[in-house]
Structures are given as structure tokens and as C-alpha cells.
Amino acid sequence: MPSHFLSNSSSIPTSNPSDSAIAAGSGSDSQNDALSLTSSFSSSSASRLSEMWSYMWIPFLISLSKELSLAKAQSEIFLPTELERDSSSRCSPPESRLNYQPVIGILSHPGDGASGRLSNASTASYIAASYVKFVESAGARVIPLIYNEPTDILFQKLDLVNGVLFTGGWCKSGLYYEVVERIFKKILERNDAGDHFPLYAICLGFELISMIITKDRRILERFNAADMASTLQFTKDFNLEGTVFQRFPPDLLKKLSTDCLAMQKHRYGISPEKFQKNQYLSRFFQVLTTCKDEDDKDYVSTLQAHNYPVTAFQWHPEKNSFEWGYPTIPHTEDAIQVTQHVANFLVSEARKSLNRPSPQKVLDNLIYNYSPTYCGKAGRGYDEVYIFTRSSL
């Protein structure tokens, strides 16, 4: 036992001095060995004890830390009844002056949109589904304005919408021209009366309202842009505010002038020179963009009315996202963003309309009451069209 090795030497019996000396020497060695062993044993035991306590403390400290964190988190969570204010007031209400269920009227065009492959009825008219999807993608619904239905019915439907879209096509005469002219004048009258009633005129729509405003059916010039994608070149000192381009991100605006993101599908247009010389056009519109055709000739491509929410496009913003019949249509992410921003502007303008028609009358006339026809298998033209004939009116 350690107590034996550390006992006093006087308790050990001796016989003679020499033996005592030997015993003393031997005892000294034994004491040194005992002290060394004791020190080693004590050091080892202390080390193991320290390690044992470390292993015991680590999980305890982790557990304690978690409990403290949880307690702190719980102390920062308040029930609505514990707050002095109503938590529902955190969501600001939408602007009451805006209409969050806007409806756009799209005017149908003579024919079936497929050169008679779908319907050769003389009373047939159509709306390409890409225009419908274009409007719906921005948060509005569509009522078809069937151009050859009775006038009173057509204008009753016009009273149900918050904006109008004139589509592309080919017809520039007869009943169709007359209906476009009457609707265009009605749009201006509604705006003059205080309603904010937007119009998008795309391709043929651009051409028709140019003819109507100038009262000149020969105002159009020939261009070679029947199937191509192009850039848009913005005019000098162009002010974005209040135009279709006002919410475009700066990088996308830049790409519009460097990348071919605008689909062209037309043979007619107006040169910048002719536009400037025509006082009717220059007084009504400002030029936002121009383009070059395949022969490097410039034509006006985007117009914005000075005093009305009227925008005219001599290019096709709807095709990038919703038409697949031509390989020249751009489908890049940037091209899709162009389509979306242009659609968003039309619907944002329509939300400002004061017109609040009967909800039931709107439901009775929505394009959901008709079914589109798939015609994309032909590999050209539109992918889908809505066809209207006398039997469906």
C-alpha cells in the first residue's frame, strides 16, 4: 500500500549500524520507486478523469445550447392576440381604382386562318389562339368581337371589354375595314369621354389604323419582311415613360437593339420619311422604334399615340411565346421576356379602364364558350385558331 512506502524509517528495527546503513540505502531506493510509481499512477488517473469529464460535458453543453436557442425563438413568437395591432393589416389592399378582372376584345379576321383547310364557309372568321394566350398570360380574359355578326351585337360586346386588340392578317377592304374603322373611332370616343381604353394594333392592325388616320388607303409602302426576326432600333431622345417599353429591364432594352428578338411577318409598312411628311400620322403618333427589312430598307415598327393609350406594332410580339410554325420565330429566353412585357403593358393599361360590365354578360361572351382548332400539323401558319361561322353565332 502507498501508506507503507511512505511510513517513518524509525519504525523499522535495525541490528547494527552497517545493516542500518544498508537498510537506509535500500529504503531510499524503495521510496524513490514508490514516489515515481505514485506520481505516474496519479498523472494517468488524472488524465483519464479529465477525458471522461470532457466526454460527459460536451453533449450536455450541446443540449443546453439547443434548449437556450429554442427558448429564445419561442420567446420571440407572438400570437395575433398578443399584438396591439391587427395582423391582417400587414397586407396592403389593392388599388381600388383599378380593375383586377380586365377583359380584352379581340376582333376576328375573315377566313379560317388556314387557307380554307379548316373551313371554306363564306361567313367564317377566325382569331389565332396565340393572341388569346398572349392576353391571358398577362392576367386578362378575352371576348371575341366577331367582325361580321350584327352590328348591335358586336357593339354590345364592345361595351363588355376594357381594351381592344386588332390582329394581323391580310384584309384591307370591305366590311372588315369598315368595322375596324368604326371600332377605332369608338375607342377614341371612349377615351375622350374620360375612360382609359387601350388599343393594340398588330401588323395588319398597324396598317389599317394608319390608313384610317391618314384617310389614305395608299399610305403603305412595300417592304421585304415576310419571314424574319430583327432588332428594334429606338429613336433619338426616346422617352420610355408611358410607353410599352417603360417596364423593360435595361439589359433587355439593350438586347432589343442588338439581338433579333422581334418577329416580322409583313410585306407592307411606312418609311420614317413618309411618316414625318404625313401630318396626320406625325400629329397622332410618335415613333418609338424602326426596323430594317431584308433589303436594308428602314420602316417604322412601333408607334405610340400622343394623347391616347394606342400602340401600333409592325412586328409580332405574340409569336415568340405562342407560335411554332416557322423556324425563324425567336424562342430564346430574352424573346419570351419581350412577349411577356408587351402583354403586361396592354393588360396594365386595361386595368385603368372605368368600364365595369355585368359579370354574367361577360361570362356569357368569353372565348371560353368556344373551342380552338389545332392546325399546327401542317407545319406552317398558326398552331391553333378559333373559328366562328354563322352557325356558331
Region locations from a protein language model:
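Short linear segments in intrinsically disordered or otherwise low-structure-confidence regions
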Residues: 16-18
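N-terminal beta1-alpha1 cap of cysteine-dependent amidohydrolase-like domains
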Residues: 2-8, 13, 24-25, 29, ...
